[in-house]
Curated annotation (Swiss-Prot):
Keywords: Cytoplasm, Methyltransferase, S-adenosyl-L-methionine, Transferase, tRNA processing. It is found in: Cytoplasm. Its main location: cytoplasm. One of its GO terms (cellular component) is cytosol. This is tRNA (guanine-N(1)-)-methyltransferase. Specifically methylates guanosine-37 in various tRNAs. The gene is trmD. Its EC number is 2.1.1.228. CDD domains: TrmD-like. Coiled coil: none annotated. The lineage of its organism: Bacteria, Pseudomonadati, Pseudomonadota, Betaproteobacteria, Burkholderiales. It comes from Methylibium petroleiphilum (strain ATCC BAA-1232 / LMG 22953 / PM1). S-adenosyl-L-methionine binds at G117, L137, G138, D139, F140, V141, L142.
């Protein structure tokens, strides 16, 4: 799949492609990441891509025309390569929250054009003309859209075949089934004399059905205590079994 990123700071993406698990996605060609600098499409000697907002106020606004020319270059390059015409995504506080379900949907598509805003934002006319979807990482403000773009590409890349050593790993991630992940343990079995410092006995039992049950119950308990909204969503989507519901009802002080 292919991501085209419109960014004033393409240098932020270079280290990301060379390290970690997702490096395999770029080396194998599972992910093709193309970076487009809007300044290259400015029509002035200073390569200026921003100006003061009409109506006054602080900060600067990214101009429509350099972004439109950059997007046109993306479309020309896609056509020349025989690539699909992908949707335009903008990272914005006004966007819908980026969820694992949306990531999974994107992972099965041809890719996207990612627009990284800066300054006070992007001229609304570019958004109205070209943006297909707005996404947000949460209710907080970043300096630009580059970090959300990196987060999205990372989340999608790790779902591509061959990127993770164990292809079942992502199936046990938090949110993959609508719930938070269960706790994990490794060596040594005991860190101290206290019972709380040991690995839960069920995980050492070798009884696969009991281990699966323990993990499911820990998922349910952790999600119910930390993110009850996810329990409500899973229930509404029919993701909870009768056994899940019985266990949730047995948890003290939650009122689920």
């Amino acid at each position: 799949m292919r991501f085209d990123v419109l960014t004033l700071f393409p240098e932020l993406f270079a280290p990301f492609q060379a390290v970690g698990v997702t490096r395999r996605a770029f080396e194998s060609g599972a992910i093709d990441l193309k970076l487009w600098q809007p300044r290259d499409f400015a029509d002035n000697a200073y390569r200026r891509v921003d100006d003061r907002p009409y109506g006054g106020g602080p900060g600067m606004v990214m101009l429509v025309e350099p972004l439109e020319r950059a997007l046109a270059a993306v479309r020309d390059d896609q056509a020349a390569a025989g690539a699909a015409r992908t949707p335009v995504l903008l990272f914005s506080p006004a966007g819908a929250p980026l969820t694992q379900r949306r990531v999974e949907a994107l992972a099965s598509e041809a890719g996207a054009v990612l627009v990284c805003g800066r300054y006070e934002g992007i001229d609304q006319r570019f958004i109205d003309r070209h943006v297909d979807e707005e996404l947000s990482l949460g209710d907080f403000v970043l300096s630009g859209g580059e970090l959300p773009a990196l987060a999205l590409v990372d989340a999608v890349a790790r779902l591509q075949p061959g990127v993770l050593n164990d292809q079942t790993s992502h199936q046990q991630d938090s949110f993959s089934d609508g719930l938070l992940d269960c706790p994990h343990y490794s060596r040594p079995e005991h860190l101290g004399d206290a019972a709380a410092d040991g690995v839960p006995a069920t995980l050492m039992s070798g009884h696969h059905a009991e281990i699966a049950r323990w993990r499911r119950e820990r998922q349910l308990e952790l999600t119910a205590r930390r993110r009850p909204d996810l329990i409500a969503a899973a229930r509404a989507q029919g993701r909870l079994t009768k056994a899940d519901e019985r266990y949730l009802q047995s948890l003290p002080g939650l009122g689920l």
